[in-house]
Amino acid sequence: MEPNKDDNVSLAATAQISAPPVLQDASSLPGFSAIPPVVPPSFPPPMAPIPMMPHPPVARPPTFRPPVSQNGGVKTSDSDSESDDEHIEISEESKQVRERQEKALQDLLVKRRAAAMAVPTNDKAVRDRLRRLGEPITLFGEQEMERRARLTQLLTRYDINGQLDKLVKDHEEDVTPKEEVDDEVLEYPFFTEGPKELREARIEIAKFSVKRAAVRIQRAKRRRDDPDEDMDAETKWALKHAKHMALDCSNFGDDRPLTGCSFSRDGKILATCSLSGVTKLWEMPQVTNTIAVLKDHKERATDVVFSPVDDCLATASADRTAKLWKTDGTLLQTFEGHLDRLARVAFHPSGKYLGTTSYDKTWRLWDINTGAELLLQEGHSRSVYGIAFQQDGALAASCGLDSLARVWDLRTGRSILVFQGHIKPVFSVNFSPNGYHLASGGEDNQCRIWDLRMRKSLYIIPAHANLVSQVKYEPQEGYFLATASYDMKVNIWSGRDFSLVKSLAGHESKVASLDITADSSCIATVSHDRTIKLWTSSGNDDEDEEKETMDIDL
């Protein structure tokens, strides 16, 4: 490629400018002497600038447009379409990997949203938020942190579904100062308006309890002031009587494990129930002949109890009902209303009301004459299992799987005492005849004695090697206390110092229930080994031993 003429001209001009000037000899000039010439230092000649060459033009690649068909679509050859199908097709393994990646990404996004979600830490606020969202406030076995985690998942789900308006509204209600007022309101007890029959029942219970309490106090004062009354001697005699209790008879009660037993008020009939749903009435004292067989429950029977004033009896079942019977097998009433299976049943001392406990976290009070539900009592956070009435009739005690025992005033409907001490579910409670002691037994293998006057635990009995299924005071004066356990034993404890008096062993499986006759002469126990056992004391032998001891002393 030849250079341009303009480029040659510029190179020549540059060369002329860059050449050094020619120095004349100073001696040839007038007025100057001959001076040796000064030789300038040698410098390398400057390099000429490199000429800028223009860039060659860049040729753009030709654009190709696919032919367009008449209907507007792009024409493709069969070979091209087949090659495209080969590149687009994905294997099943790749699809599974992609699905796993998408799921992992979705889970990560959900976790990020959940972590960024504003969720209250106050348990009351969490419950209130769940109530407003229409969700269950508390699930079975749920703790505070689990409840908050469930609320977080619900709010995250609503956020993903795009229900932001509801979330923003709830959040505004939570951050407003009104939340503090709502929390203060929740601290106060809430009341549910009951029917007119409940008010009448409370008045009747109050009148009944005042009379019974007056009689009990007068009797206690008389025994204290009367010199002929020797309470210590009576206590020793009762404990000695209990110490010599032994197995009197045993019989199979059903084809399935037995769950409950109860004596009639005169001690002539023993009722037992079993997992087969059948309740049987046995003739005492040998329990070999059945008087009646009650077969109306559709599920397993969980408890049976006789009325304290007549020959009626009540049964509880897992079919969510309780039934009232006569001793001849006639069904009188069916009590329906519980939302889950029943656990225990108990008569009020007046014989007019029936209390039932259920796994729906409530216990209820029924009118046995009309079959109407008078009271639905909440208060336990988990299933309610045991129930008992004070002999005066003023108080009721309940226990449950929340490890608490609560005492209720039936005259006002208030929870007056909450006994905390068991570390596992409580299955049985029973009032002492003195009116101010309460015994409770539970899964922690302990039997605790509570004092209603001192409002605290009076004594802790390490009763058994397995859970305590039932506790029962001697019905006359509370001289001793009997406990049944899943360790296949029934233990008798002193009602004064709670020392072990006697251990009744003979069952081959879990002891489910026990009962004591009104005169304390016999103890009945039923077990999962399907047997009924009666324990009695040989009083004549004790009297003979005392006579022999007196003769020796003389």
Swiss-Prot record:
Gene Ontology BP terms: cell fate determination; cell-cell signaling; embryo sac development; embryo sac egg cell differentiation; mRNA splicing, via spliceosome
Summary of the knockout phenotype: Gametophytic lethality due to female gametophyte defect, when homozygous.
Skewed-composition ranges (Basic and acidic residues): 88-99
Localization in the cell: Nucleus speckle
Organism of this sequence: Arabidopsis thaliana
Xref: SMART domains: SFM, WD40
Protein name: U4/U6 small nuclear ribonucleoprotein PRP4-like protein
Record key words, sorted: mRNA processing, mRNA splicing, Nucleus, Repeat, Spliceosome, WD repeat
Gene3D superfamilies: Pre-mRNA processing factor 4 domain, YVTN repeat-like/Quinoprotein amine dehydrogenase
Domain of life: Eukaryota
Pfam families, per database record: PRP4, WD40
Region annotation (Disordered) ranges: 48-99
Function: Participates in pre-mRNA splicing. Part of the U4/U5/U6 tri-snRNP complex, one of the building blocks of the spliceosome. Essential for reproduction. In female gametophyte, is necessary for the egg cell and central cell fate determination and hence reproductive success. Involved in a mechanism that prevents accessory cells from adopting gametic cell fate. Modulates egg cell signaling center that regulates the development of all female gametophytic cells.
GO terms under cellular component: nuclear speck; spliceosomal complex
Repeat positions for WD: 253-292, 296-335, 337-376, 379-418, 421-460, 463-503, 506-545
Disulfide bonds, paired cysteine numbers: none
Biased composition (Pro residues): 48-65
